[in-house]
Amino acid sequence: MVLNYIWIAFFLIALVIATVRLVFMGDVEVFPAMMNSTFDSSKTAFEISLGLTGVLSLWLGIMKIGEKGGVVNVLAKVLSPVFTRLFPDIPKGHPVTGSIFMNVAANMLGLDNAATPLGLRAMEQLQELNTKKDTATNPMIMFLVLNTSGLTLIPVSIMVYRAQMGAAQPTDIFVPILLATFFSTLAGIVVTSIYQRINLLNRTMLLTLGGMSAVVAGIIWGFAQMDKAQMNVVSRSVANILLMLIIVVFILAGMRKKLNVYDAFIEGAKEGFTTAVRIIPYLVAILVGIGVFRASGAMDMLIDGIKWLVSTLGGNTDFVGALPTALMKPLSGSGARGMMVDAMTTYGADSFVGRLACVFQGSTDTTFYILAVYFGSVGIRYTRHAVACGLLADLAGVVAAIAICYMFF
């Protein structure tokens, strides 16, 4: 519903701005430019979707091997000690615990097709424990904040888009996204725990969160000792080594399960073509809307206004061109994806803005969409502090993404 209003606003605002430019400034080229943008954007959307097919097939095939090889189950076991303390209101041994573990593990691996059904199942089981059927419980809110914070280990789709948009090194945003999404998730956990008075100062949580924070701090400190060129080389090398290791580990996991790894890959890869075709209308819709908005001059007015505000406050304005992606992400995943593609098209995939838009896309998730789908599936009307905690996690991810990208790029 939110995306519907945003899409309509693109055209109505563009019409108003273009009319003002035509009537008061004598700009007779603005309407031809807007119409040309609709054709160009439609063509771009199709070409992007077509180019995604091969890489999507590759990674969906790899993910299918990992899924069938039990990697999700292994991750769930690793997360178990931490999650039992984040959800103290869930009775020990309740089956919802397994659904939550599996959902978060699937999200971390980027297995959206598996994560969503598992998440909806977890919400149904949490609703069974709910004494006020129209009001969100503490475990529901913590579960949704973990989803909206966008914790991911493998930002496959973003790397795929970067490859299609001509990035020299599509994986160079891998480490920055890992760091930014860590801060987003950490902020979400801390803020929600404060609301719910969950004690994070026990030994397990301190060791886990403290250990992860120490590792992240060490990574940031290590990169801070390098110049930009060296940092880029090391980041790129680490990202590609990790991705290659993930592929090999998934294959070994499949072999350990006596899986026909090749057939599993083919099964997953078939979904690549279907997925690429399925996103064509969504990409056409959002890219045409953004194209008209930009061609009318409205996007430049928005960005220039934010730049003026930031510069007035004495800040660096390099990040402003990527902000539309960050602002759109809590509202709509496809809208934010369109903004990310538009940023790479306008500024270049290897520009600071293009890279930052990708990190924005990977550091958080679609907060309002997730809340609507998950709460709507079980009839929750009163969401309590869920929106506040989700948006604070998003804000932490955006701030972290900006700081990290200034350091890396």
Residues of each region from the PLM?
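Sparse, context-dependent recognition of short Cys/His-centered cofactor- or disulfide-binding micro-motifs
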Residues: 60, 94-96, 136-139, 240, ...
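Generic signal for short, ordered secondary-structure residues
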Residues: 101, 105, 140, 231-234, ...
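Short amphipathic alpha-helical patches
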Residues: 65-76, 89, 102, 106, ...
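Signature of multi-pass transmembrane helix bundles
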Residues: 1-54, 163-293, 311-313, 385-409
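Membrane-embedded alpha-helical segments and adjacent helix-loop junctions characteristic
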Residues: 29-128, 257-346
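Short, structured coil/loop segments at alpha-helix boundaries
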Residues: 25-28, 93-97, 134-137, 227, ...
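Hydrophobic alpha-helical segments, principally membrane-spanning helices and signal/leader peptides
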Residues: 36-39, 46, 95-97, 132-140, ...
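C-terminal transmembrane helix pair
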Residues: 114-115, 122-161, 167-197, 323-409
